[in-house]
Amino acid sequence: SKGLPNGVPVDEWGIRMEAGTCNPVGANVSRGGATNGPAAVYAIRKWDEWLRAYAPPGAAAMDFYQSLPSLSSGNVAQQIFWYTAFTASLVGKDPNNKVVDANGMPLWRMGPSPKGPYWEEGMKLGYQDVGSWTLFKSTDVERRKAAWLYAQFAVSKTVSLKKADVGLTFVRKSTVNHKHFTKRAPELGGLIEFYRSDNRNVWSPTGINVPDYPKLAQLWWQHIGEVNSGTFTPQQTMDRLADEMDLVMS
């Protein structure tokens, strides 16, 4: 569905939740969801096709940690999932870094997410995790106050600027717009231009339709692997995934 930061009434997970409620209705098309709908099936089929046609040899057999070192080998044409925390290892001079030139300038470029045939204006177009600080009511008041002071220090302008300069993860708009990053922008492969553009607004986090992220997230990789292995077709896989998601949410 259309809607930012998440679609209403159906979000990017394909989970339906009627407006004005906090209870998910379901993920299966039969329950008004979209996890096994045409758009989701198309996305999984296209991912499988691209993996087979364009990924480096052996990529399909890699796990998450094996895939990370391969990025700096220079044998990857396009990456569809990326943690900004890893950007620092992809920039700068290093004999083992094959994705920068002799001057340390990136040979890659970050860009907005591509649009599929089912995407419409007003829908989100990408995903990014959003961090937060949680202060428990059960914690002693004085300790909560200390934690609150530390949190303010950790996200202050000066500290945020330094952390972003080293790790290339941003928590403040002022950091993104700082003159220091205007100077560094050419060596960061489009990262600064992206976060200064409106494109960042359609990269939104998981929304309130997802009642139990850990339980539901683990279902995804288990089922998606069955497409890659050829055990099930994309439609069969998404049907099975939608059924299991509804079972978890019931």
Regions found by a protein language model. Give the residues of each.
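Long, aromatic- and glycine/proline-rich binding clefts that accommodate carbohydrate-like moieties
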Residues: 106-115, 164-222, 226
